[in-house]
């Protein structure tokens, strides 16, 4: 696929900024760009209802932090997640996510997930091989599969590692100069869980760190330049506060930073040729590992712009009798780095064997295509299912 065609499809994946920018703001607009941006979409309704803050252990921890699995109460669990994506723009784009885990003994767990992102049907009217219109319908998609192993090093601390295969097919004619892209990546995560006393209440504190998608760049066929995958560092905290025997609150906060170099901006007076040479040297020739370290100090605006590259989320969850749940949250991204700002709400219902959750996005600007995004999660507790068959 030609660059322009793939860029068009990639823009459909990316989260659009809300509203138009004045020219001076456009000059400052400098988001961190990656390929396979579908890897950054939060898949589950629980965290989505809390502003994308996902520190507390649950069946979908594979995405947020797989080191949390040894602290899950149930022996095993499986979840099915579905998100109709950017329905303000298109009617057939969606994300499906399957996740599951199994605890081995009391101190370790294995887990896996499968992600499938469909861009729906896209009509083409140009055949690059003949130069003629063909009215062809294509179905571009991205997918990934990963497995992880987590281990408790003490009663309060655990580590995890995951490996992931990523595949992106945004092409429509498998000619010599274009083909689907694939990449391999790994996650490294740790999690700390402890009980602390706040007044007369024994509260549960969780702190997690996950560096995800550390891996190779991705190349689409004959393109001269490979592209960065979304390597990301996530630091989160959650505090569960019991009110009484039937009621409890959890508050959570996450901070995220893409560990990918910022695309260089053309300097005033710099020729196009010099700029292209500098982009090649400072961006395309940088390896994925070098790019991780470079990402902490390469923003054109200095330290202030580096801080703008940190997205943050805050959320709260109320649980009644381990059955009914209400959630709310807020997600913030600098207007110079993508301008994703939205509130979220969610609700859930849980029985011994299954749970059902939903999340809903309320964007701060109605022009934001994320507005009114829904997520659904159906979870299964293997211990609860076994208990049903024993009755």
What is the predicted function of each stretch?
Residues 1-8:
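Bacterial N-terminal signal peptides that target proteins for export
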Residues 9-17:
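Bacterial N-terminal signal peptides
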Residues 18-22:
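Sec/Tat signal peptide C-region and signal peptidase I cleavage site
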């Amino acid at each position: 696929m030609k660059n322009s065609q793939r860029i068009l499809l990639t823009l459909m994946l990316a989260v659009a900024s809300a509203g138009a920018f004045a020219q001076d703001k456009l000059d400052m607009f400098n988001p961190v760009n990656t390929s396979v941006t579908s890897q950054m979409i939060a898949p589950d309704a629980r965290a989505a209802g809390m502003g994308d803050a996902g520190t507390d252990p649950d069946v979908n921890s594979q995405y947020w932090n797989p080191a949390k699995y040894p602290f899950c109460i149930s022996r095993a669990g499986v979840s099915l997640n579905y998100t109709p994506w950017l329905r303000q723009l298109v009617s057939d784009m969606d994300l499906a996510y399957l996740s599951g885990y199994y605890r081995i003994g009391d101190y370790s767990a294995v887990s896996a997930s499968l992600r499938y992102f469909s861009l729906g049907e896209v009509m083409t009217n140009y055949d690059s091989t003949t130069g003629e219109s063909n009215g062809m319908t294509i179905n571009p998609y991205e997918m990934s599969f990963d497995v992880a192993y987590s281990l408790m090093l003490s009663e309060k601390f655990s580590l995890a590692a995951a490996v992931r295969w990523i595949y992106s097919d945004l092409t429509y004619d498998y000619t010599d100069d274009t083909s689907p892209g694939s990449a391999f990546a790994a996650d490294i995560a740790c999690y700390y869980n402890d009980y602390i006393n706040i007044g007369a209440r024994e509260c549960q504190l969780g702190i997690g760190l996950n560096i995800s998608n550390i891996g190779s760049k991705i190349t689409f066929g004959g393109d001269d330049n490979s592209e960065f995958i979304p390597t990301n560092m996530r630091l989160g905290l959650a505090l569960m506060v019991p009110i009484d025997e039937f009621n409890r609150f959890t508050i959570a906060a996450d901070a995220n930073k893409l560990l990918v170099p910022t695309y260089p901006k053309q300097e005033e007076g710099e020729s196009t040729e010099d700029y292209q040479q500098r982009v090649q040297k400072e961006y395309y020739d940088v390896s994925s590992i070098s790019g991780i370290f470079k990402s902490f100090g390469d923003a054109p605006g200095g330290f202030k712009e580096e801080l703008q590259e940190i997205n943050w989320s805050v959320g709260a969850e109320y649980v009644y009798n381990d059955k009914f749940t209400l959630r709310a949250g807020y997600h913030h991204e600098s207007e110079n780095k993508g301008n994703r700002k939205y509130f979220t709400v969610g609700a859930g219902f849980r029985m011994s064997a299954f749970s059902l959750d939903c999340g809903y996005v309320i964007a701060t600007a109605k022009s934001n295509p994320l507005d009114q995004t829904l997520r659904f999660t159906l979870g299964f507790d293997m211990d609860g299912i076994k208990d049903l068959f024993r009755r």
